Amino acid sequence: MRFLSFWRLLLYHALCLALPEVSAHTVELNEMFGQIQSPGYPDSYPSDSEVTWNITVPEGFRIKLYFMHFNLESSYLCEYDYVKVETEDQVLATFCGRETTDTEQTPGQEVVLSPGTFMSVTFRSDFSNEERFTGFDAHYMAVDVDECKEREDEELSCDHYCHNYIGGYYCSCRFGYILHTDNRTCRVECSGNLFTQRTGTITSPDYPNPYPKSSECSYTIDLEEGFMVSLQFEDIFDIEDHPEVPCPYDYIKIKAGSKVWGPFCGEKSPEPISTQTHSVQILFRSDNSGENRGWRLSYRAAGNECPKLQPPVYGKIEPSQAVYSFKDQVLVSCDTGYKVLKDNEVMDTFQIECLKDGAWSNKIPTCKIVDCGAPAGLKHGLVTFSTRNNLTTYKSEIRYSCQQPYYKMLHNTTGVYTCSAHGTWTNEVLKRSLPTCLPVCGVPKFSRKQISRIFNGRPAQKGTMPWIAMLSHLNGQPFCGGSLLGSNWVLTAAHCLHQSLDPEEPTLHSSYLLSPSDFKIIMGKHWRRRSDEDEQHLHVKRTTLHPLYNPSTFENDLGLVELSESPRLNDFVMPVCLPEQPSTEGTMVIVSGWGKQFLQRFPENLMEIEIPIVNSDTCQEAYTPLKKKVTKDMICAGEKEGGKDACAGDSGGPMVTKDAERDQWYLVGVVSWGEDCGKKDRYGVYSYIYPNKDWIQRITGVRN
């Protein structure tokens, strides 16, 4: 540092008074960056020089100044030569010398930042320099201001989110808020809030966080006339206030009709408010400053009380409350097995309401036990009551049974039904469906064990063949036989159901078929001509021939007759069973009918023969000379020596056999054709049932 003598200082001040003012000039800089150098740089700067550089950058920027070279005269507190950096109202730095000391400072690596868009840099040199000083080389640039981080003025900072960009910034708000017109304050759209429930909770926006600024909120509680709303402030109550002026900034106000409560602010919650009306408006206002947490209130409505209710016998009331008031509703229901009875109308539940005048909308109904009513009748069956006095109410029990021994219950169900809580008779398996009574097949009351074996076609005992049917013309003349299947079907030979065909032209036309009105079915028949009280004369509904029936060869010689009404099953009328398995050679079968005995005359009563089943090859050999063919749908029976056979008038009749294990009779065949009735080596040929069983069941639906 240069030594300053008293005399030099005195001379300096004297010269300053004697010499004219130092020449000075100003340079205006408006670029975003630039360079500033002392006069004459890099040579020595002149004495008595003063230059000012005024740097201005756009809004949103500040100025950064740094020095690459600095070499000025040293002086105490930079009294001689110096560089001064300042703004309009603030000196940012003063530099001089070659290195920093206790009394002078050089910029070194220091960066000078302006707080705003303006910076002034002034260089000044005094009247003399004893040494050579090279001055300075400085650079400046505009740098972006991060307003989001550096904004100190609360009134200009963003409420929620601040987004900086080069040269400026903008504000945005959280979800549910909108930006105020000042572009920094976030407010909520909180007007028009409507509450119509009888109880509820209302809070300031974002409670318990600070509520938004510059907001005008309104909340309306609007209930049905007859209610009275009460308000209760809860938990935190924190609204900006003023120590001297009541609620000048933020406040909450309550309006109900002509009454007004408030404004309220501060940290003390208002007392509970009973508005005595059904419609209340709550107003809340906030200004553009403050960080207060807001308020929370609950409301509830009360009305006139209604009298206490007594539930009906065998019933209940829901909900069960100590007190019921206006608009409360209760649901009356009954215990399981009971129904609500109101004004002679039965229903599951009944609802009543407490009215605004304190009266119930209706009287409590009664509970009536469920009645399933008289059980439905069962076809071919009967019903008995298991409960005393033939009760039909809830949990009463009945039992269905079939008319034995002629009918049996399908699937062997118990037949027990209980009156359910829904008012229906219900079975564990069948639910609401009635059981089905199926005809018992192949179990005649009169056992064949009671008579000796029949030879050469002897009269059959009455009732031993209860399935045999007589096909009779309306004049009473019989023409064929048949077998009862199920409750209303008769199986016979197809050739029985049409007129005789011309041997020269054996084509079956529909006009040759018998009409249902051309004949009738007689069940329970024993005598051929005479009638007795056990006979049942039945009308024919329709006839169906086997689709593969050939009238020339008698292949598939089967026909079904559907009855218009079901016969009454008894000791003399019962269906025969369909076969469960194919028949085997040698099995003894019984053929019955009212046909001629050995081509001489018709018998007076039902006749039967017992013969064995014959091997189909043996049967075919017997008919080969006659050019007759025995097909797979046919079965033969008879004795080689002859003497026992079905004859004219027996066509369509049954050939049956007994299953000893099941003690049931099964249909093996239907009398179809033969040659020379009862002659040696002339077996009877029958339509075989087993291979045609599927077709029979498909048409009739009959199951054993």
From Swiss-Prot:
Domain Sushi residues, every copy: 304-369, 370-439
Phenotype on disruption: Mice are smaller and more vulnerable indicating developmental and growth defects. Mice serum has low C4 and C3 cleavage activity together with low MASP2 activation.
Binding site for Ca(2+) 2: D144, V145, E147, N164, Y165, G168
One GO CC annotation: nucleoplasm
Signal peptide: 1-24
Compartments, record wording: Secreted
Binding residues for Ca(2+) 1: E73, D81, D126, S128
A GO BP entry: complement activation, lectin pathway
EC number: 3.4.21.-
Modified how: The iron and 2-oxoglutarate dependent 3-hydroxylation of aspartate and asparagine is (R) stereospecific within EGF domains. N-glycosylated. Some N-linked glycan are of the complex-type.
Tissue: Protein of the plasma which is primarily expressed by liver.
Disulfide linkage: C78-C96, C148-C162, C158-C171, C173-C186, C190-C217, C247-C265, C306-C354, C334-C367, C372-C419, C402-C437, C441-C577, C480-C496, C619-C636, C647-C677
Role summary: Functions in the lectin pathway of complement, which performs a key role in innate immunity by recognizing pathogens through patterns of sugar moieties and neutralizing them. The lectin pathway is triggered upon binding of mannan-binding lectin (MBL) and ficolins to sugar moieties which leads to activation of the associated proteases MASP1 and MASP2. Functions as an endopeptidase and may activate MASP2 or C2 or directly activate C3 the key component of complement reaction. Isoform 2 may have an inhibitory effect on the activation of the lectin pathway of complement or may cleave IGFBP5.
Name by which UniProt lists this protein: Mannan-binding lectin serine protease 1
